[in-house]
Amino acid sequence: CNLSCPYCHREGELNPAKEISLEKIEEIIKNAKSIGIKKIKITGGEPLVREDIADVIDIIKKYNFEDISLVTNGFLLDKYAFELKGAGLNRVNIGCDSLSSNILLKTAENIKNGLRAAKEAGLTPIKLNMVVLKGINDKEIKKMIEFARENDAVLQLIELINTDDEFYKEHYFNLKEIEKELEKKAIIVIKKDMHNRRQYDLGDVMIEIVRPFTKDFCENCTRLRVTSDGRIKPCLMRNDNLIDFKDKCSLIEAINEKGVLYVQAN
């Protein structure tokens, strides 16, 4: 990644050191399609620092998934948005933790340029990911809702994941009270299948709450992750049960493992 945000969970990888080959990506994608996986999300790290990212998307596109999305910090999105759309990318999530200059390594200008490019390229609906941090950006939630409204974007308010005990203790912000306020204001509350997440439709903007350390999150998790070296990761929070990819049976094993993980956690 071209940033080093102190709260980043790195998709659960402690020491990512490799970059998966295009050949391995296609092998995994082909087998994922064969067992009924419908959606692919590309994340990182920062996917756009990979020089062949458009080739990665082009490979995925060949297999006709319902949705191909990408999570980015937005720094390079202005440069690559149209190329990514041409390769087959449907939409993007942009990290947008603050609109204050340099509060979290990014400037408002970086975010706005990436957002503008994504809109012009048709990478929509755009989601803005805001990790809410006590004492850093928790006073900006209303401002961010307005920003999402102005830009026809969905705002995801995300609770901090504990990757550093000291940082977590100082900056964890519980979103329960915010969620109560949204429930009062919402025209419609939508419950999504994935993670049992709730979306609050305020009429002219949609707000989604993401709370990673909850029973609902684990019980309704429908994701498998692929690590940077091509192994299958059934759970974001664990690294002791990675599965080496060999064929579609590896993916099926990982899916079965998710059920075991949930029982153990509860």
Predicted regions and their residues:
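Canonical Radical SAM [4Fe-4S] cluster-binding loop centered on the CxxxCxxC motif
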Residues: 1-22, 234-237
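Radical SAM/AdoMet-radical enzyme domain recognition
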Residues: 19-42, 46-156
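Auxiliary Fe-S-binding modules of radical SAM enzymes
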Residues: 143, 149-150, 157-266
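Glycine-rich phosphate-binding "P-loop"
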Residues: 14, 41, 242
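A short acidic, helix-capping loop that chelates divalent metal ions and anchors anionic groups
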Residues: 13-16, 100-105, 164-168
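N-terminal pre-triad scaffold of radical SAM enzymes
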Residues: 1-7, 26, 30-43, 217, ...
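Short intrinsically disordered, low-complexity coil segments enriched in acidic
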Residues: 1-8, 105-116, 251
